[in-house]
A protein has these predicted regions:
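Catalytic beta/alpha-barrel core
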Residues: 5-7, 28-36, 55-57, 62, ...
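NAD(P)-binding Rossmann-fold cofactor-contacting core
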Residues: 359-380
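Conserved N-terminal beta1-alpha1 strand-loop-helix module at the mouth
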Residues: 1-61, 260-262
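Rossmann-like adenosine-cofactor binding region
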Residues: 381-448, 453
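Active-site-adjacent beta->alpha loops and helix N-cap segments on the catalytic face
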Residues: 35-47, 88-102, 118-121, 145-157
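Phosphate/diphosphate ligand-binding glycine-rich loop within oxidoreductases
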Residues: 224-332, 432, 440, 444
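Adenosine-phosphate binding glycine-rich loop
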Residues: 424, 428-488
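Glycine-rich adenosine-cofactor-binding loop
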Residues: 171, 227-233, 321, 329, ...
Length: 488
């Protein structure tokens, strides 16, 4: 069931949240009672449009808070609230006294760890200890300090499901966001959402509107195929918008999630049986080739990949950056038979250079760390130029493959402009709305191609690899632009 969690101060605030919940498909509304007086609580309990969970969290225990919690739980029970959620730390005596008064209300007995996710053995012990007190549902929620922490929760759910225990379990925090979806898909009874990103009752909650409209949460089933993106950071990524809309458009039983990770090998080891395919972004496009994989001759020649499918748990690698950029080169004649400077020496730079070589370009590469530019130039059989020395020649085209708005990049373009004016600047950084590079080009009336065009071009190929289906470029492009400022 989908829960909208909210902490109102007044009945009026509650009514706004209730309306939002009804409009966006909530099954339950969790009312946090810490800030409510008795009069407002009674008004809320009398409103029956949505079933409710009454919850009272105590962060720092005191006699007055425990007394207030006890009083409000009793009011909720006496008014036949559908669920109460009681933290096991309130103790057996507190819980059993309330249980004696319960008639129609269902009990959720919960455990929270706001600092870390214990190891699986300890999580099992916590569940076993909780089950010594009879309840309708048990809840174990922990804080994720890495994406890997979600794996322990998934294994705990697997054990609970086998025992027939109704368990609500997921990780909180930024690293627990995608784990919430995996938990719900793999048997967690409830999915908790927020009113909006500013009114979360727990860190890592996602707004109900985004859950409903982007992720189609009501259509997340055990059979749903999971895709996602690995990299760090991922705040700038819009792949979740593109692919989830694509799945909706094509009626695919699939979902796409963000996985901000530090170690791709470790992530693949733990999650390869939960995920069907991945997009790969900075900083792992080159590193991913070091892992055991199945890949084509082109992937090996480029030296980077941005897409992965799992077949019998084995990763198959693709490079849709190459396919997408090649399309841009075909459309833009200035990217053919030109003298081109590529800025950057990572996986995207490799892909761009490989594509440009197919169209008779004279290619030079530079990078903040010149040694990396020299190494890449030697490998790709092109020329490296030192960004700190005077350039010996002019450039027809400049292509940026690095994350935008850094001082090195802007100062480098200013240096180029002091010597000559390129005919075209291509900025592969996705954040085109705030690109200082593109703004500088506009001032000098230089033609540009922005990173959004590149993103869409490669994502279309990626979607085809994931689903075997083509997608309407016009529709998906419009959707991503319309929802561009949404965050996951």
């Amino acid at each position: 069931m989908i829960v909208l969690s909210y902490q109102p101060k007044t009945f009026r605030e509650f009514k706004k949240a209730l309306q939002y919940g009804l409009e966006n498909g909530a099954d339950l509304l969790e009312v946090r009672g810490e800030k409510l007086n008795e009069k407002e609580l009674l008004k809320i309990l009398s409103e029956k449009s949505l079933p409710k969970i009454f919850t009272y969290r105590i962060n720092q225990f005191s006699y007055s808070k425990i007394k207030d919690a006890s009083k409000k739980y009793r009011i909720a029970i006496q008014n036949n609230v559908e669920f109460i959620d009681i933290d096991i730390n309130l103790g057996k005596s507190f819980i059993n006294k309330l249980k004696k008064e319960i008639q129609n209300t269902k009990l959720i007995l919960s455990y929270h760890n706001y600092e870390k996710t214990p190891k699986l053995k300890q999580l099992i012990s916590i569940l076993d200890y909780s089950r010594k007190i009879s309840a309708d549902y048990y809840k174990i929620v922990t804080f994720a300090n890495s994406v890997i922490d979600n794996y322990n929760i998934l294994k705990l759910l697997e054990i609970a499901n086998k025992k027939g225990v109704r368990l609500i379990s997921h990780c909180m925090g930024e690293y627990g966001k995608s784990g919430r979806f995996l938990s719900y898909k793999n048997g967690s009874s409830f999915f908790y959402s927020s009113y909006n990103s500013n009114k979360q009752t727990a860190e890592g909650q996602i707004s109900l509107e985004v859950l409903n409209k982007i992720f189609r949460i009501k259509q997340l089933y055990p059979s749903t195929r999971v895709y996602g993106i690995i990299g760090n950071p991922l705040k700038q990524s819009k792949s979740w918008l593109f692919h989830n809309f694509g799945f909706k458009l094509k009626k695919s039983n699939a979902i796409y999630l963000n996985f901000p990770i530090y170690d791709p090998e470790l992530f693949i080891y733990y999650f390869k049986n939960y995920i069907r395919g991945l997009s790969i972004t900075i900083p792992f496009k080159e590193e991913i080739l070091k892992l055991p994989n199945i890949s084509s001759k082109i992937i090996k020649e480029i030296g980077s990949a941005n897409t992965m499918l799992f077949k019998d748990s084995k990763p198959i690698l693709f490079n849709t950056d190459y396919l997408g950029f090649k399309e841009i080169v075909k459309k833009e004649k200035l990217l053919q038979n030109s003298k081109t400077l590529v800025i950057g020496a990572g996986g995207s730079a490799r892909t761009v250079i490989y594509a440009l070589k197919k169209f008779n370009n004279e290619i030079l590469v530079t990078n903040r760390t010149y040694d990396r530019a020299e190494s890449l130039a030697s490998e790709m059989e092109i020329k490296a130029i030192n960004p700190r020395k005077k350039f010996e020649s002019d450039f027809d085209v400049v292509i940026n493959t690095t994350p935008g708005n850094n001082f090195f990049l802007i100062n480098l373009l200013k240096k180029i402009l002091s010597q000559n004016k390129p005919k075209l600047v291509v900025d592969l950084d996705l954040n085109f709305k705030e690109s200082k590079l593109l703004a500088l080009c506009k001032t000098h009336k230089i033609k540009t191609v922005n990173g959004f065009e590149f993103f869409i071009a490669q994502a279309v190929h990626q979607f085809k690899i994931f689903t075997g289906k083509n997608i309407s470029l016009r529709k998906v492009k419009r959707f991503v632009l319309d929802n561009y400022d949404k965050q996951f």
